Amino acid sequence: MLSKEIKFGEEARRALERGVDTLANAVKVTLGPKGRNVVLDRKFGSPTITNDGVTIARDIDLKDPWENLGCQLVKEVAIKTNDVAGDGTTTATLLAQAMIKEGLKNVAAGANPMIMRRGIDQAVKAVVDEIKTLSKPVESRDSIAQVAAISADDPEIGQLIADAMEKVGRDGVITVEESQSVGTSLEVVEGMNFDRGYISPYMITNTEKMEAVLEDPYILISDKKISSIGEVLPVLEKVVQTGKPMLLIAEEVEGEALATLVVNKLRGTFNCVAVKAPAFGERRKAMLEDIAILTNGQVASEELGVKMENVSLDMLGKARQIVIKKDETIIVDGAGSEQAIRDRSANIKRQLEETESEYDREKLQERLAKLSGGVAVIQVGAATETELKERKHRIEDALAATKAAVEEGIVSGGGVTLINAIKAIEKIEAQGDELTGINLVKKAMEEPLRQIANNAGIEGSVVVEKVKEAETGIGYNALTGVYESMIAAGIIDPAKVTRSAVQNAASISAMVLTTEAVVSELPGEDEMKGMGAGGMGGMGGMGGMM
């Protein structure tokens, strides 16, 4: 069993602070338009070059167990902010470092951390309310492009994301994929798509593109395995009489059933394409139901009391066109009623709010977007693998930041909103250690702007004082060296990003300040023996595998 060591009081807090500083100092050099990059070593493959706070934070683990605890705490700030808002991780880390540094000074001087915490909470509430007041809704295409361009530090990416959002709507799915070419492009897939293609290549209608295109088809949706043609014969005969093609979605189509469909297709008697149902288990049932609602059909499921032999034409779904590729099916313009689709979307949104699982949230988001129509794919290209990874990462970040901006609006960027929020903090009436907690947050609000200026090679404190004296919204443009209106200059941040950064930083800082003991594991005696020079002698023959 591993032994534990405990550190108390000031010694414990200082060890945590050293860990916080190590991580924050590595992350904060990336802040602002003139921020630097950080190179991350990889055991396999090429190193990663990035200026993304959360990517750097995730990669840092410290040797000293006490310092590592502080490092992990502030890493949590970056990860939580990234999960909620998709950006602002460097700002959050920097704010946490500033609050912890200032707070520990006061605790060492005799302030009561529990009362200070109350002051911190009050100040954060005032800042959050001020951010809401200052935020402006994002409505125009240009604002969306601006937010994305700032996050990715590339106007071309900004335009690409704005195009994607314009085409698939704000709830639409936008995915980022690696491309084989050097350039970055946008491809929009209209309608609902799922990652299952034709079961047999004999079903294709366009040999050049290797795809099957069905115009105005019927859609039979089933959750069972179909191996006998007798099961589906009654409904097939009804469809043949209409002269229309058909898409058959089932768990599996095999044996006699598949052979019969292929022979009829080759003879030109009947055009039917079979595809496997998407997803698995409960998610498959939900997705089949989504397809049914989108196409105004019903799922032929014995669980729902619908037997295959009893399926009539009015139970089949319809769409204007269906394109079936090797591993993808796209349903364009399904015949489902708008009201039914809206109700289904509302139901998925409710599930989204309730779920705790990140994976479930991602899958529900995908389903929601597929229902609301349209999937945009940004194909990222670059000359080298290292550049490709870095570029893809920037686009994913920009996409998350843009979605956050659409949700809660935008505020002035460049650390200006936090400086402007200081006035709101000053209005709070308090005294004693509570006031100390409030002042600690007030001082931390200056830190992002100071760091942006420092990274640009300018004296940060001078810039902070000038911006404090200027009107609301006026800040320092680190790229041009000019003091101007941030929003007019296109320097903007999503309000959600700024809000999350402040809340998460304050939460972790309050925890560090109120820590009185830190417990860490020490290597056990057996482990220590094993680590001796002779302990691993018998494994010398494996040297070649390293």
Curated annotation (Swiss-Prot):
Identify its protein family. Answer: Belongs to the chaperonin (HSP60) family.
Q: Which UniProt keywords apply?
A: ATP-binding, Chaperone, Cytoplasm, Isomerase, Nucleotide-binding
> Binding positions for ATP?
30-33, 87-91, 414, 477-479, 493
Q: How does it assemble?
A: Forms a cylinder of 14 subunits composed of two heptameric rings stacked back-to-back. Interacts with the co-chaperonin GroES.
Question: Which PROSITE patterns does the protein's record reference?
Answer: CHAPERONINS_CPN60
Q: What is the lineage of its organism?
A: Bacteria, Bacillati, Bacillota, Clostridia, Eubacteriales
Its subcellular locations are: Cytoplasm
Q: Which reaction does it catalyse?
A: ATP + H2O + a folded polypeptide = ADP + phosphate + an unfolded polypeptide
Main location per the UniProt record: cytoplasm
Q: Name one Pfam family in it.
A: Cpn60_TCP1
Role according to the record: Together with its co-chaperonin GroES, plays an essential role in assisting protein folding. The GroEL-GroES system forms a nano-cage that allows encapsulation of the non-native substrate proteins and provides a physical environment optimized to promote and accelerate protein folding.
> What's the protein name?
Chaperonin GroEL
GO MF: ATP binding; ATP-dependent protein folding chaperone; isomerase activity; unfolded protein binding
Q: Would you tell me the Gene Ontology cellular component terms?
A: cytoplasm
Q: What SUPFAM superfamilies does the annotation carry?
A: GroEL apical domain-like (SSF52029), GroEL equatorial domain-like (SSF48592), GroEL-intermediate domain like (SSF54849)
EC number(s): the record gives: 5.6.1.7
Could you state one GO biological process linked to this protein?
protein refolding
